[in-house]
Design a protein with these regions (language model features):
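Acidic/His-rich, metal-assisted hydrolase cores and their charged scaffolds
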Residues: 1-172
Length: 172
């Protein structure tokens, strides 16, 4: 099985995972409360396209061979009650790690979360999973040139930075 932990809010990343799973004939399971809520809403609003017969309920996962399943889950930051943390700690009621499972973290730990993330990684590897967590992160934030392009296209009267470190906000 392939298990991918990502931010529920990164709908584009989830779409990429679904597209790849579909291309290779894998069924997709969405797990984690926020992941289910956001992807359901994104699908209803047309922000994400899930091909017919690709998405299955987690209860159906046991009906498919491991090599035909991709589980997209919350928990990329080691959050205690996120689905991946519960899976790693063997307290998830529907998923248990099997030797040979591939678990991909699609983001770097946010500063301050490293200890929790590495705890989850260690628990997964101790259960026989192959964990991929380096060189998988692609920022969801626009770079300087992308911001310039957005401003050029939209020509806003005002631009107010609202997220980031003070030194970055000041330069913006």
């Amino acid at each position: 099985r392939i298990i991918i932990a990502t931010f529920a809010s990164n709908v584009d990343r989830v779409q990429q995972i679904i597209n790849s799973a579909y291309k290779y004939g894998r069924k997709v399971i969405i797990e984690g409360r926020s992941m289910v809520n956001i992807i359901t809403t994104a699908s209803e609003l047309g922000y994400i396209n899930i091909p017919d017969n690709t998405l299955i309920d987690i209860s159906q996962m046991k009906n498919y061979p491991d090599e035909k399943v991709v589980l997209i889950t919350t928990g990329s930051q080691g959050e205690n009650m996120a689905a991946l943390s519960r899976i790693a700690a063997s307290i998830h009621n529907k998923v248990a790690i099997k030797p040979g499972d591939v678990v991909i973290f699609s983001s770097h730990p946010i500063p301050g979360n490293e200890k929790a993330v590495f705890k989850v990684i260690n628990e997964l590897e101790a259960k026989g999973a192959h964990v991929i967590f380096e060189d998988t992160h692609v920022s969801g934030h626009a770079c300087r040139e992308e911001l310039k392009l957005i401003y050029a296209l939209t020509k806003p009267k005002y631009a107010i930075p609202v997220h980031g470190e003070y030194r970055h906000l000041k330069r913006h």
